[in-house]
């Protein structure tokens, strides 16, 4: 920039009268009248500044030199900037880390000095930036040690002797003065005192403090300097009072009484601003035509309140409110006047930035074209009413975050839509966003820093400074910063909403941020008259403070009027600049859509002209169209095709409850977050699963033995013993197979004896360490099996939750995960040795269906169930052990084929062992049976695991483990998932149950899409009503154990279909087992199946991250991270921390607490509560308790003594100002030193423990203070 700094002795000078030529401020046809030479005397008699300098510079800092500015009469019109590509250099030009905490920033309004002022809790610094060196240097700190501005005023304020370092309040932002008072800066020394500093007094003997303004009884939230009457400063705070101070009336260091008091009769004031002076942006003739009076920029001001109310006042009539606008649905946080137009921008906690027209007349530019014919509207017919509320803003920008700081770029534009509005929020991951009013959906610039922005200020129309939470000062040149459109990709395709119903594409024509003023368009008429002046009595109450100060207000207002008449600013007649008559360019299509939307967030205001005339000539306007969004509802069409094929009773997919949930994505998110299971861990789990031998006690052993005797099961039950018992049961019916059975029994017994002998010899040769390792491995496998048995019902439950809201993609994902877990469970059970099963297995795992004949009269509860292997959970039930009742009697086959199959297997043993058991691939097992199992399994893999005999009998997977168990019947062909899904869905219980409404229920709707089971699977026997899944009896028993300590008690579990019913009724057909892991040691990736659980979970996790499915991401990480190691621990902790923040935003605090409680990972949450302040006021003197002197005193004492005992006497239960303690406990009459106190209805306070002892332990019902107040407990 060419604004070069000047020497120290010339720092107080500014542009003289001769230097202030019309061309300095003129632009286009707007000519500035000369300052009157006779009225050049300043009304400020003792003010240190006597010259007036402009607040903003309108020329580019690099395009025009200072001399050319003074010689030229007009500014050149700059055409709209055309985007030519992404700029190569970044706009970040200045960056400096401050050693002290920063909270606010403002510019020094002196064009000859490149300075900004920054304030923090212990810092008020003057900074100078150099464009040549790209540096920012701190010139002086006004509150550092030895430069305490309050050291001479502490006695007058009654605060006693303070410490060397002053603590400033960070509630309100620092502000700098204008023109004659441009060397003044204002900051709150504490929450209720406004302090004025002189930045020219930087010497060691100078006191920079000018005065203190202290009349507010509660915190000051905002203050502002007047641009015209520079000696006036306005302030507003929590006491809902607006106070105006005249710095000329300060005869001492303290102003204890404001010159003007206005009680707004509303809630607390968040922000208050003077109307800025137009600084010669229009001619005097236009102003006179508009208002007919002199300039009113020094009189008007506005305030915004906690209720979202925007009030506009005129100082000449302080008892009346000119405009009263309900600006926001929630608290309004900030406001900012447009520098050159009659508009106010407001920001609120509702995440909206609204633009309001607040002029007295009609706007020169309409957002929606208004015709010349005046139409009576409800607003136009209420001119005589005391109030006139503005309902619809002229422009609304939905930001998505609370707008805490808001400023309009100080640059004049003919069209107000070309103005830039910058805003920021103190929330995390937010910098400074700059929007163009011409394009409110996409910001023009996003100025991001390493941490959240705390404040910013425009130095000129191109340079903006901001500070962040890392205490860094950053400066940005916007002409070097790429726009958001430059970095936005054109090729983007997304699902339209959470239902996945349609696709979104973006228009390839990006457009720009400027409004085209050339092409007019016909817009339908929409009128809105100006708001009328509102009496202060029309508010919620009459202003007490305003009336009380009426006597002094009249003299003050007269002085202000007299001072304004002497400033020579009478040539700047008119209140605000008139807008150009050149029309805006809105298209019919974009405005037709907007005209139908009457919402608060997507609306424009329009005004009707009074009639023909120079000011009422309104042209056609047009704006920038939004990008075209084209949708393809292909999933919707396919879904309708699927619904049309369903039975009539199933076409009513959504119940009223589901429709209520699907109304908004927020309700869907809350429902899923509450219903889904996020963890299988609970309290006491580690103690319950220490090892396999501690899973049961003596009572369980006794129950097990009793049931084994009842069902006729021996204690050493094996698969071979089951075959023998089966053959013995069949012996009475099939007498022809006696010899075959005896041969098979002798063969199996001989093999069993040989295997037992070899196993005994191996055990004798092994040492104790080998036995211990085998035992540990068995226990480790058992623990994995137990975890899988916990995860499988959770996956089923999550699938049912997604099916309840008809979210089919996520439903299929959880069904796929469930089937992969079943595959893992099958692998573990295959590797689990039968002889090493824990003796404490639950008895409902031991059961085998033995059904003779085809008698349908037999009840299912009288049948016997036998098994001794965990394969029963997932394996297909062998046909050799199944009842023949499920097949016609004509197709029954005798068991004589057993001997031939066993003989055939024995003949191939030698070749299998020689060819498939090389030394490098496999170790020699402990017994020949295990070696034979491995060899046969590898043979199955190489030869497609199918051995067909002459009868087309298919060998089962059991024959890879236990030699001598045939599969006699061929499986029926399986039905694919698509066939089941698109065809008629049948009940999993069977067609015989006509009254079954399993698929008509909420959860049943999801289960109908489960993968079907084949007739060879154990679940297929459910359809015939002859078999119940005993393996899931164990799951249901575990669910009972989990229900007491479960993470979330889902409401779906209390409905008709529970999780156990889901698995009892779901037609599952798990995948076939593969070879053990030991057989893949040569090349693991070559034999890794596509349904491998870890690979599948990683793919699902990656897809969920890309699609932004946070619930699925957290579910997968929480459930499967410890078992499958899907990602790093750092990524897991960051994901969990972000998910906790999302839950807090949706007010799901109980759910987030439960997740943190059951999380096995330590998650550090940067809670926003660390930024909260709890102000404590003294009960005696009413002042804010800070106790900084006593804190430093006790700290020094602790350092001298070398221990922390003196610090225990420090607290906030006493006041350093009045030297008195706060209210004592009503029970023990001791100071209350903690924030956890009990407050009774009568007003007495006490320790929580004392009141608990009085009311609960002693059973008292009266106040312990003796006031006879009855406490109702």
UniProtKB/Swiss-Prot annotation:
It comes from Zygosaccharomyces rouxii (strain ATCC 2623 / CBS 732 / NBRC 1130 / NCYC 568 / NRRL Y-229). The gene is RTC1. It is found in: Vacuole. The keyword Repeat applies. May be involved in a process influencing telomere capping. Signal peptide: none annotated. This is Restriction of telomere capping protein 1. Pfam families: WD40, zf-RING_16. The lineage of its organism: Eukaryota, Fungi, Dikarya, Ascomycota, Saccharomycotina. The keyword Nucleus does not apply.
